[in-house]
Each structure stands twice: as structure tokens, then as C-alpha cells.
Amino acid sequence: MGKSAATRPSAAAAPEAPAPVETAATETASTEYEPLLPRIPILDLSPQVDEGHWAASAFSGEVVPFRATAFREGHDRIGVDLLLLNPSGTQTEHHMRAIAPGTDRWEVEVQLEQEGLWRYRVQAYADEYATWRHNAEVKVPAAIDVELMLTIAHDLLAKAASDKRRSTAERRHLSEAARVVADAERGDDERFQAAVDDRIKRILTERPVVALPSLSATRAVLVERTRAGVGSWYEFFPRSEGAKRLPDGAWQSGTFRTAAKRLPEVAAMGFDVVYLPPIHPIGRTFRKGPNNTLEAGENDPGSPWAIGGPDGGHDAIHPDLGTEKDFVFFLGKAKQAGLEIALDLALQASPDHPWVTQHQEWFTTLPDGTIAYAENPPKKYQDIYPINFDNDYDGLRTEVLRIVRYWMSLGVRIFRVDNPHTKPLHFWEWLIHTVNETDPDVVFLAEAFTRPALLHTLAKAGFQQSYTYFTWRNTKEELEEFLTGLAEDTPDFLWPNLFVNTPDILTEYLQFGGPAAFKIRAAIAATGAPTWGVYSGFELYENVARPGAEEYIDNEKYEYRPRDYARAAALGRSLAPYLTMLNRARSEHPALRQLRNLHVHGSEDDAVLVYSKFLAGEFTRSGKPDAVLVIANVDPHSVRETMVHLDVTAFGIEPGAQFEVRDLVTGQRWTWGADNYVRLDAFTEPVHILTVKPLEAAR
């Protein structure tokens, strides 16, 4: 089910047009006004997206904080519960606790496991026992209204004891307390203590004496499979894996079968998903040559994004890569290695695509009769025709759905969508909803480097993952704001995929930062979000750009790029062991696989970034809390010495307590407190990735 379907209003709830103004002005003249607020106001529910227009998002295993603002007039105490309905129709109740004193904000964290649509409401109520206890603990010791307070206590205890939902033992304890409170032969203090006994307080906290129950509106949370929100991605071009230059200078393309040999190495680095650029036939007309030149040689392979030729279009496989059988073989080898394959879905066409002659209405025809090619000024893509959705929308969307389902039938369950922000958003909402209605495990990643409103709406419309501007967030201040925003501002609908590089993006930070820059970016991406990714060559420190551009020289989009990973490793020039360490840390530390739990800490250096991730023991398989603290020198050209100042309560340590940290990068251990000295040398190890344990647990 798509996100939008969860809370889309029915036709009856959303008439086609508002009533005329004069009708609206007179229709309630003799009707009593019905307040919008319940008896006890409940406001600002979270998670919710656009007041419930869309279902909020969560992935299986995610710990979701449910929050609401609830209060009542006067000083009487209230209680607040989360009423949570799972996809199977079973409702559970969860007591919410007051947070941030003075804000009337309530919260409870719940780990959502079952995939499907969850619904929740918040119930607020007058907590009669808590109100009585608050008043009695002031009045009784001061000998004010003692008998009245005890009479009220007896009535409350008797009422609670009559609640058949309580256990027999609880009802017995409550009845006995009521009997003691009512016994005027006993002293006032004994009677009072019977009503505030720790056991009675526990019983009436776990199941309060409720009055004036009030309910919020219903909101929905769509829980998707874990891989939709958590994973380590690795991108490679299958044509480069196994490609060879022949004696005559021509190239022999790699195939799915040669590329399959690379999969165990990718899996050994700890990656979960291998993303392939388009695997379809490539057009010849206006084919781009090396480095995006306008003239291609006879043996230049062209850009995989210039889709379509005599051998077919989006439902065809480039003959150099193999056949459908070879692709299925490749998928099988990936599965054996514990990998999923993500396929590129790029809705555009080369001038040679069958669509150009069969469905010219799917493109934009200019006044001179030519078809408009793609442009992103100052870039021009003469080898690519963009799609026009407005001439034959129904025909085009039917064809795209057919294509997606074809690749699904072969075993593809993840699609990386190229430039979705250049296509109509209602189309994506329809496509993703239609696919997920029958195949909820299919995941769509939006490769959309665009304005926040567009990016956010794509996510709300159904995209499970989104590219972000992470690649251009490099300073401490930029990264603090960026990572905090991901964890706090948008997690209800946007799950980021933090790629450190792409075939299109080689930032100046990587171009000129040396090996330290590669470590820094990988460490922050791998620990800052549940999903991250690298494009092949990153582990070889590839950093040479085409002059004047943030793109690689000899870009793999336009030529074959076989790489000698084994030789680089033998020479000690490979980052693969570091990437392996990062993915192992993610595997071993569930806190790193959560999105909403990132907390930024302070340092006295404007280049030292500090953040932690924490997961309480109730949410881990081991039953033990998990805490990881990351301290990064984001200046790849320097040695930084500074003090870091930690809010230790953010990762489960009592204020003032010492704790042990162990560096997953070097294996070193230290005993720390809230304020600590650090030295980070960009020329050796620029990042600490520290596990945190109380001293008694570390021994």
C-alpha cells in the first residue's frame, strides 16, 4: 500500500466543491456549535505527515517515538496512553510519559516490527488517583481535610478493585488497602500509608483510575521491510567488470557473468545492495564519447542513460552484457552472496529508442519538427530525449508499469529512479502505490538533487529512499545541521541514502582532501544514517576530476573502467578494509541502524564534529543498551587537539559517571567522562568511532 492510500479521504468526506458562501454563512444559525476539542485537549500528534494526509513512514525494527501534547484546565493530574493497532488488528496500550517540563508534551517509544499499515490514537484522561495523591501528600501531613482525603482514597481504591481487567492479586491488594483506609479504628497515618504504598502506586500507575477519557484523531504509520530503510549500497557498471582491451585497441565489454565474479568481494566488504546503472541497449545517434565529448568512436560504449536502440528499449538487455538468462544468473549469484540488486529506472530515451517511432507523442516536438533533447543548463544531453507525460498520460503510465513489473518478474525488488523530480509527481504516486499494493517489498530510491519542497513531496508520495545534499555538506556546522535535520525534522517521511560519491559527483572535498577525506566522508555516511552508499573506485581513492567540473576524468558513464582492486590492496592503497570495518560496525551495533536517535554533542574546535547514537536495551536482541560515539576531524589537512563536551545522558550514562570507550578504528580503550581531550590526526586516523559502556559493564 502506498503512503497516500493510508489516509486519503473518501469521496463523501471530500466533496468536489465547497458550499456557496451565502449557504455557509446561514447554515448553522439554529444549530448548536460542536467544539473541535475533546474534553481533555490532545494536539500535535507525532508521527504524522501533513495532518494525516499521508501515512507516516517507519521500517521494520525502527524505534518510533510517539508524541502528543495533552493538558487540562486547573491543576488536576492527567494520564496519556498510546492506543496502537497493528496490521493484524490487535490493539496494544502504551503509557506515555511527560517530557520537557512545562510543555505538556508526552512520549512513548515503540519498536515497530510487523510490516503493513499501523494506526494509532492517543487517549488522555483524568488520573483520579494521581490527583488524589498529589493533594493528599500535601494535606494529610499538614492535618488538613484528613478524613475527607481518606474517604476519597477509599472510594478510589474500591473502584479500582472492582475493575475485572485487573489480575486477581491486584484486586486483592486494592481491596485490602481500601479496607485499611476505611478502618477508623486505625491511625490516620496507617490509613494514609495503605493508600500510598509502593505496591498500590505501581498498580494504579500501570492501570490508572480513569475519568473523562478523551481521544485524538486517528493517524497511520506504514511500516515497510527493513531494507527499505537500512542498507549499505555499492554501485558498479557491469560492463566494466571483466572488460578487456583487445590487441587491436578495441574493448571487449564485461558481461553479467564476469560481473558476477565481483559480487563476493562486494559482499565481503559488508555491503547489502549492488546498484547497477541502466543495463539496456544504448543509442548510436549523438552518442557521447569519452569525457562527454560530442564525437564517439566506433568502439566507444556510450552512456547507459541514453536508453534504446535497434535491440530494444527499457525492457531489453544490452547484448554486450548478455541475455535475460545471464541476468537471472547474475541475480542468483547476488542472492547467494547475500546481496540484493537495485536496477536503474531512467524514464528517458535515446533518439534510437523504439518509442521515438512508435510513440512520438511521448516526447516534446518543437515548432521546427524536431524532438527536444535533455538540457540542464549549461549541460546539454543531445543523446537523450526527455519524456512528455501530458500527451498520452494513460498510455505512458501503463507502459512504465509493464516495464517495472517485467523486471520484478525476473527478481528485481529495488529500483533507483533517475531524476524523478523532472517527471510529474502524481505519476510517481500512482506508480509506487500500484506496485506496492501487490508487492509491498519493492523499494524505490529517488535520485533527486532538487529543492526541499520537491524532494519532500516525492518522499511523501511514496519513494522509500531519497538522495540528499550530503555530498556538499562538509563543515562541522553544515553537518550538524544536516544530520540533525535528518533525525528530527523529516524522519516521518524521508529516509536518506547517503552516497559519498556517484559517477556524476566528485566533490572538491574528495578531489583535494587526500585519503583522509575519503575516510571522513565514509565514516560520517556510514554512521550518520541507516542507509549509505559508495560508487566503485571510491575504495581506490579515485580523485581526479575533469577540469572545471565536479565529475571524474575519463568518466565511466562514457567508457569502460576496469579496476585492479587486488593490486591496490596488495600495495596498501585500498580503502576496502576501512569500508569493511564501517559495515561491520553497522552490523554489530543496532544503534547505527536507526534514524531518529542521532544526538549532536559539543567540541571546542570548529572542525571537530561530535555525535552519538543510542538504543536502549529493551530494543536490542541482546537486551543490552547499545551506544556509539563518533568524533570526526572534518578538516582533512590538519591535526586537531580539543576538548569535547558530552551530554552523557543521551547515550545512557548517568550524569557524573565515568565510562569506557573503545575505538572501533584502532582498538584503543579509554576511560572517559563528560569532558574529554581528543587528538585527531587527519594523516593517520581522522575519526574516532567509539563504543560506550558503563565501567561495570566493560569489566
Would you name each region that the model predicts?
Residues S232-Y234, V274-L276, I341-L343, F415, ...:
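Hydrophobic faces of well-ordered beta-strands that scaffold small-molecule active sites
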Residues G229-G254, I282-F330, T357-D394, I553-P562:
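Aromatic- and acidic-residue-enriched carbohydrate-binding clefts of CAZyme catalytic domains
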Residues M1-A243, P247-D272, P281, A334, ...:
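Carbohydrate-interacting/catalytic domains
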Residues Y275-R284, L345-P354, D418-P424, E447-R451, ...:
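Short, solvent-exposed turn/loop segments enriched in Gly/Ser/Thr/Pro and often Arg
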Residues S350-E361, W428, N436-E437, F449-E477, ...:
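Substrate-binding cleft/loops of secretory-pathway carbohydrate-active enzymes
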Residues G254-E265, D392-W407, A517-A522:
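Short, acidic/polar
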Residues T434-E447, P452, N474-G548, G617-T620:
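Catalytic-core region of carbohydrate-active enzymes that cleave or remodel glycosidic bonds
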Residues T365, N388-L455:
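Active-site neighborhood of glycoside hydrolase catalytic domains
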